[in-house]
Curated annotation (Swiss-Prot):
Cofactor binding description: Binds 1 lipoyl cofactor covalently.
Function as written in the Swiss-Prot or TrEMBL entry: The glycine cleavage system catalyzes the degradation of glycine. The H protein shuttles the methylamine group of glycine from the P protein to the T protein.
Cofactor: (R)-lipoate
Superkingdom of source: Bacteria
Occurrences of domain Lipoyl-binding (ranges): 24-105
Family listed: Belongs to the GcvH family.
Pfam families for the chain: GCV_H (PF01597)
N6-lipoyllysine: residues carrying this PTM: 65
Protein known as: Glycine cleavage system H protein
Listed NCBIfam families: gcvH, PRK01202.1
Biological process annotations from GO: glycine decarboxylation via glycine cleavage system
Keywords from the named record: Lipoyl
Database matches in SUPFAM superfamilies: Single hybrid motif (SSF51230)
Organism: Burkholderia vietnamiensis (strain G4 / LMG 22486) (Burkholderia cepacia (strain R1808))
Amino acid sequence: MSNVPADLKYTDEHEWVRTEADGTLTVGITDHAQSTLGDIVFLELPQVGKSVNAGDAVGVVESVKAASDIYSPVSGEVVAINEEATDSPEGVNGDAYGVWLFKLKLADGASTDKLIDAAAYSKLID
């Protein structure tokens, strides 16, 4: 059974989202995603300043088994990427919820309403 922290929101595509005190959103991939992918060997993340729409493929995670797109959970602007994660992508395998990938500033009118809670995500992956 995968770890699904209750304080985060999730997407059907296996990203987790944490709302920060300043209103930005921190995004990573879930424990289920890293477990399914296996040993992660490469991360391609979006450029800071890039405008993205909810559901856009914004990056790639590659493992020894497969490559999978990383999707933007909401519409907004990329305001930061985790360069430590790109330098040491295997860290995601060890701590999927501690190693974030990128941060977003919500676009005007965008919301997190379509994200799912931990209970719904747990049902999705069971």
